[in-house]
Amino acid sequence: MAGTLYIVATPIGNLEDITRRALRILAEVDLIAAEDTRHSKKLLHHFNIATPLISYYREKEQQRAEELIAKLHAGTNIALISDAGTPAISDPGAIVVNMARQASIPIVPVPGPSALTAAVSCAGLIPGEFLFVGFAPPKSTQRCTLLRSLRDLLYPLVFYEAPHRIERFLKDCLEILGDREILWARELSKKYEEITHATLGGLLASLNTEKLRGESVFIIYPPTVLP
């Protein structure tokens, strides 16, 4: 009988956000596949969980996914976790999930923290529709091509971005999309959490690149439609 693949959400900053169910699953499974075992060891140690860990990172995702599928076929129950938040959303995980689905291996989500839903919940989106893009391409040429393809959509656009690319990302957004409203959520659930509502131009003008830390979520509102 095949094992079960659990997709387990872990805190994005505040350890109090982990669910009791997540803790139970992490303690009960036979193996935990973690994006970075060094990072996850600290989390598991904090909660006195001694389940064995195996690394599952993007550079070796295909190879590791095949190994995990073999273990699942052999009856091993495995929990997949990322460094923070929900796995397989702009993090490694999609390959093993797809392989498990194609092999009819049970897949069980264990929902919890997510930077995406945390940011969207503070954006006041009515009726709640949005397009999640994830990380834009790191190179400006490719990023601008993507932004042009999204320019005419009447949906809020949700991006993740790394601190060292924020200024260039915002400049490209302003150039391609125009001076739209934007919500910037950074350090979510952490000590220095900050949620800023501004325009792209205003945010760029006030940006202090020396203080940028941690990954950010940006929600770019659709263009104002005049009657």
Residue spans of the language-model regions?
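A contiguous loop/helix-start segment that scaffolds small-molecule binding in enzyme catalytic cores
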Residues: 2, 76, 155-227
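Conserved helicase motor
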Residues: 55-62, 136-140
